Amino acid sequence: MKSDKIRIESILANGEHINLECKKATNTIPNSIWETYSSFANTYGGTILLGIVENLKEKDIKKRFQVVGVEDSQKIITDFWNTINSNKVNENILSDSDVNIIDIDGKKVICINVPQADWRIKPIYLNDNIYKGTYKRNQEGDYRCTERQVRAMIRDSFEEGNDGILIEHYNMDDIDLDSLHRYRNLFRVWNADHIWNEVDDKTFLRNLGGYIVNREEGKEGLSMAGLMMFGKGLSIRERFDNFRMDYLNFCNLIGEERYSDRLTYDGRWENNLYQFFSIVLPKMTFDLPRPFRMEGMQRIDDTPQHKAVREAFTNAIIHADLMMESAILRIEKHDDKLCFRNPGLLRLPLEQIYEGGNSKARNPRIQNMLRMIGFGENIGSGFPQIIAAWKETKWGEPELKNKIDLDEVELILPLGKVANVVNNDRKDDRKELTERQKVIVNLIKGNDRITIDEMTEKVKVSEKTIRRELSVLYEKGILIREGGRKDGRWVITK
C-alpha cells in the first residue's frame, strides 16, 4: 500500500536509531534478527526491516539506506513464524498484523513491528538461556544484558511486588519506635475510628504488611516494607547496603558552594523511608507560591502544585527498585526545577504513563502505608494529575525520563522563575497557623474528643480537607492523637 511505503520512507529518513533495525536478508532470515527481537521487546519496541541495506560510511541520511528487497518473501515469513514459535525464544509476543510485506518501487520489504513486552513476561530471551540470551537496545544497537539487569526484570515480573518478602533474623528490635509512633499518630489523624489504633505496635505493623508470620515454615519477622519504612538506620544498612537516600538543595548557591542543604547518612536521623519522606517533603514545597484562594469563608493553602509534588515524591518511593545494586533514591531541588530520581525503570511505555496507565507499584505495601496517611492518588491517576497541575502554571512541562543506561527513572518538574519568589504572606504562614487551622485548634481545645465528622460540620469543609489540615498540625508538632478510636483524644502540644 502507498501509505505503508510512505511510512517506511519516513522511518528511513530519520536514520537507524533505537527503534529501527535494517537487515539485508536477501533469501534467508539473518541470525541476528533474534537478538534484535529480544532487545526491542525488552526496551521500547521497534521496527525491523528486511530487504534494506545500510551504508554506515554514508553521512547523507537520504543516501544511507538502499532498498534491495528480499527474493522470496513468503518463504522468509514462514521461516520466521516457524522459528519464533519454536524454543528459539521464550515468548512470541507478535500477532499476524505485526508482520507485513511492503512493495517499495517493485521490491519486497518485510516489516516486522515488535512491541514492548508486558512487564509481567519480561525478560524475552533466546535459546532457553535467560542470563546469556537476554538483550536490550540503546543508541548503539543491541547489547547482551548483564546478570544484574536480568535479575531486575525478573523482580519486576512479580505482580505482588517485592516489598513483602520476609527479611529473616530481623524483628521488632530493628524497628525505630520513634518513626513508627510518628506514623501511628498521623494514622490516627487520618483514621481516627480505625480499629488498628487500639492494637500493639507489632500487630499494627503486621496489619500494614510490615511484619510477616510464615506458618508453613515456622518463621516470622519484618517484611522489606516494614524494615525500609520504619527500621533503624543501622539495621537497614546492614541488610540493604546497596541502597541509600539522598536529598540535595542546589538553590541560591554562593561562591564555591556545592549545595545549600543536604540530607544523607550522617547519624543524625534514622535512615528509613518514612523519616526521609517526612523530612524532605516540607523542604521541597515550603516556598512554592500559594496564590490567595478562598473556599467559602476559609482560605485554601493546599494548591494543585503542592499536591503534585507530594504525588511525585510518593511515586519515586513506591516505584523504586530497593534491591538493585547501587540503588539511590535521590531528590534534588534547583533554582529552576525539582528532580525526583528512583532506581528501576518504568514498567509501562512512556505514552501509557502519560495517559494514566495502571503501573503496579514495585512496593505495594509501602504504597498502602503512605496512602493510609493521605499520600498517593488513586491507581492510574497520579501522573496525569501532576501534568494537569503544572499546566495551570507557566513553569514549563514536566518531563519523565526512562534512563536505561542508568537503570533509573527521573521526573523533572520545572519551576520557571518562581523558585526564588516567596511572597510575604507565605513567610507569615510558616510562622503562624492559617485561619482554618486556628479554628480547628480552638475546636479541639474546647473538646479534645471531637470527631472528624463534627469538625467537618463545624468548619464546613470536606472530610479530606479536615484530615489534610490535621496532618499539617501534626507535622508542625502542634497536635497528636492519643488512645484508640473509642477512647482516644486530641492533645495540643504547644
Placement of each model-derived feature along the sequence:
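Flexible, glycine-/charge-rich segments associated with ATP-binding catalytic modules
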Residues: 224, 237-238, 348-431, 435
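Polybasic/polar functional segments that serve as interface/processing modules
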Residues: 1-48, 52-111, 118-120, 230
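Key DNA-contact positions within bacterial/archaeal DNA-binding proteins
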Residues: 464
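Intrinsically disordered, low-complexity regulatory tails
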Residues: 91-172, 324-327, 380-384, 388, ...
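Alpha-helical DNA-recognition elements
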Residues: 472-476
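Short, cationic-aromatic polyanion-contact patches
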Residues: 430-434, 451, 482-494
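Short amphipathic alpha-helical interface segments
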Residues: 434-449
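Active-site helix-to-loop segments that bind/position phosphate- or nucleotide-bearing substrates
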Residues: 117, 133-311, 316-325, 333, ...
